[in-house]
A protein has these predicted regions:
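A short, hydrophobic C-terminal helix/tail in secreted or cell-surface proteins
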Residues: 201-206
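Helix-start/capping segments and mature chain N-termini
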Residues: 1-50, 54-57, 61-200
């Protein structure tokens, strides 16, 4: 198992870098991974210097012994995403849910839609498989409360810290009704793409 961070590298600049550093640092401490703070900063500096032109998806991985590696990928244009609701699998280790690790099997799906929007057994809307969820209702922006039941994303925390997003829980039946009646809009939020409109597909009754 590795820890990893997915970031946007934009002409040598990484948005929300401090949030990514804080998350991987905290997770490494919780999980007993070696993590050299000075080495991380030098490692990231070298990446930014080497790749000062172009826009990339940057994936940085950390193993238990403290070794860092990185990969760069293009970022495809994606004006919006499609998603469907899926109930969270049972008996998932909270460590896996709340830390960004390479143990991601619980998020796999058949990609009939681009994304899945996960809810728990109580019906609470949680997160997308590749980011958090932001819900626009009237002139307010909301994201579910964090209670150790999802991955706390860097973009999510940044928006909360800026006072742009309010924590509020939505539950599935009310959520679906508000989607059907166009009372809410749904967005994927993550540090790579910032904010992306998401079209939610609801099952039709036969």
């Amino acid at each position: 198992m590795h820890l990893f961070e997915t970031m946007k590298l934009d002409k040598g600049f990484i948005p929300r870098l401090d949030y990514h550093y804080q998350r991987i640092s905290t997770s490494s401490e919780h999980l007993g991974f070696q993590f050299d703070h000075l080495f991380w900063k030098q490692f990231i500096h070298n990446i930014k210097t080497l790749h000062s032109k172009g826009v990339f998806r940057l994936k940085v991985t950390l193993n238990k012994e403290g070794e860092l590696n990185y990969e760069l990928f293009p970022i495809p244009d994606k004006p919006f995403f499609t998603a469907r609701l899926v109930q969270q699998k049972k008996n998932i280790d909270k460590v896996i849910i709340t830390n960004k690790t390479t143990e991601r099997d619980y998020l796999t799906h058949n990609h009939f839609t681009d994304l899945i929007l996960i809810y728990d057994e109580d019906g609470k809307i949680l997160e997308f498989d590749i980011g958090n969820v932001m819900i626009q209702e009237r002139d307010k922006l909301y994201t579910p409360t964090y209670k150790g039941d999802m991955l706390p994303g860097c973009m999510r925390q940044s928006l909360i810290d800026q006072g742009k997003v309010i924590e509020k829980d939505f539950y599935i039946e009310e959520f679906k009704e508000k989607i059907k009646s166009s009372q809410i809009n749904v967005y994927l939020i993550n540090s790579l793409r910032a904010v992306s409109y998401t079209h939610l597909t609801l099952p039709t009754k036969r």
